[in-house]
Amino acid sequence: MPAKEIKYDMQAREKIMKGVDTLANAVKVTLGPKGRNVAIAKSWGAPQVTKDGVTVAKEIELEDKFENMGAQMVKEVASKTSDKAGDGTTTATVLAQAIYREGSKLVVSGMNPMSLKRGIDKGVALVVDELKKRSKTISDKKEIAQIGTISANNDATIGNIISEAMEKVGKDGVITVEEAKGMETELEIVEGMQFDRGYVSPYFVTDAEKMEVRLDDPYILLHEKKISAMKDMVPLLEQIAKTGKPLLLVAEDIEGEALATLVVNKMRGTLKCVAVKAPGFGDRRKAMLQDIAVLTGGNLISEDVGIKLENVTLQDLGTCKKVTVDKDNTTIVDGAGNRADIEGRVKQIRAEIEETKSDYDREKLQERLAKIVGGVAVIRVGAATEIEMKEKKARVEDALHATRAAVEEGIVPGGGVAFIRSIGALADAKLPDEEQQGLNIVRRALEEPLRQIAANAGCEGSIVVEKVKESNGTHGFDAETEQYVDMLKAGIIDPTKVARFALQNAASVASLLLTTEAMIAEKPKKKEPPMPAMPSDMGDYD
C-alpha cells in the first residue's frame, strides 16, 4: 500500500479553499446573459467553446490532490443540480463558493463548524419555504417559451421550439434532441404511439415510393409468443377478410408458414395486412404490448390469461384510426381504447415511476407513459459547424430540462432576484449565537448570484445588489439591457425547482467541506533517476 500524506485543520481548509476557488472562478464567468465563454482544449480537433457551467466544471482536474478534492466536491454540486433540475449549475457553484468562503473565515476565528452547519441548514430550509411561497405556476405557452429562452442563453428560437413541442405532446410527452442534417433547428411531432419495430417483410408495403405501409381503421392483433403455424389463425383471418378491414399483427416473431400466408393474401388483395415484431424484451415487451392493448381497446393474446390464438374473435382485437409502418418504426394513431382504462394504465405507470430506484427503468417507464399520453416530439438542432452543433445541442437539452422543471414546480423572478427577496425570511429567525452566524452565512451567500451576474455584465455588483434590495416584489436588474425592470414582465424567470436545488446542493456540499478536519491523499511517487547512458566506445571484444 503506497504511503499517504495527511493535512489537518488550517492547512486542509486552505487547500480546499484553493481548489473550490480554482473551479468556481472558471465556472462563474459564464453566469447571466452577458456571461463569457470558456474554451476547452481537446486531445484532438478544435477546442470546445461553451457557456455551460457544468461542462466547464466537468473538464477541471487539478494537479494538487488536496486542492482537487475541494474542486471535485464543488463539481458534484454542479452535476447534481444539472441531473435533478437541468439548469442552475453555475448558480449552485457560486453559492457553494460563497457559503464555504464565509464559513471557513468563521471556523478559522474559532467557531464550531457543526454549529455553523446547523445554522446553514436552518437558513436554507427557511429560504426554500420562501421560494415555494413566491413560486408562480405556469401553463401559458409564452411563459414556457421565456423559460426555454433564458435556459438556452437567451436564444428565443430554442425557447419557442420547446414551448411548441410541450404544447403538442403535453408535459408528460417525450421530447428528444437530435442533430439535424442542415443549418436550421426544427421540430418534428410524431403523433400517437410509436415503437421502434418495422415490418418483417417489404412485401407488405402499400406505398412503394416511401417504402411504408399505411392502414386506415385496421384491426390490431397482439400476441406475446411467436406465430409460425397458420392453422390457428385461419378462422380469425376469414372473419377479418369478410369485414374488408386491414390487419396489423404484432407478435414476438412471425415466421415460416404464417408469414408466407399473410404475404400471399396481401399480394392477392384478399387481406390488406402487415406483420410487425413486438417492441422491447422480456417483461418490458409484455408491458408494452399491454399498453398497446389498452390504447387500442383490444386484448393481449397470452396463455397467462387463458386466451389461445384459435379461440380469438373480432371482439379481442384492438382498433385505431390509422397505422403507419416503415422499415424501422410503427406508429398507431388515435387508438379506440376506453378513456377510463387508459387513465388507469397511466396512473399505474406513474406509480411505478415513483417507486423505481433504477434511472434506466425510470427512463423506460417515462417513455411508455409519454407514448400512451400524447406523442413524441423530436427537436432537430442545426448549426454551421460541428463545434457550434455540439454547443447548441447541449443548450437545447439544458433548456428542455429547465422548462420541464418550471412546469413541475412553477417559476420565480430570475436574475438572482428570488434569492434577494428570500433574505427577508431569515430576519425573524432567532438562533443560538454560533447557529445565528451560520444563518448569516446563508444571508450573505444569497446576494452572490446577482453580484456575479452584474459583474459579468461589467457593472459594480455591490451597487446593483443594494438597488435591487431597495425595490420590492419582482423588480430586479436586467443584465442584458442594464436596466431595472419587473422581471416577470420582462420574461426573466427561473424555475423554482432550479433555484431550490441550486441552494440545497450548494449548502449541502459547502457544509460538508466546512466540517472536514483532515484530508488524506497518496504521496506523489518520487521519480527514479534515469539509468546512466552506456559508454559510446566499448572497445573491441576478441
Curated annotation (Swiss-Prot):
Recorded catalytic reaction(s): these are: ATP + H2O + a folded polypeptide = ADP + phosphate + an unfolded polypeptide
Keyword list, A-Z: ATP-binding, Chaperone, Cytoplasm, Isomerase, Nucleotide-binding
Disordered, as annotated region: 523-542
Its protein name is: Chaperonin GroEL 3
Top-level taxon in the UniProt lineage: Bacteria
- Its function? Together with its co-chaperonin GroES, plays an essential role in assisting protein folding. The GroEL-GroES system forms a nano-cage that allows encapsulation of the non-native substrate proteins and provides a physical environment optimized to promote and accelerate protein folding.
Q: Where does ATP bind?
A: 30-33, 51, 87-91, 415, 494
Gene this protein is translated from: groEL3
Identify the species of origin: Syntrophus aciditrophicus (strain SB)
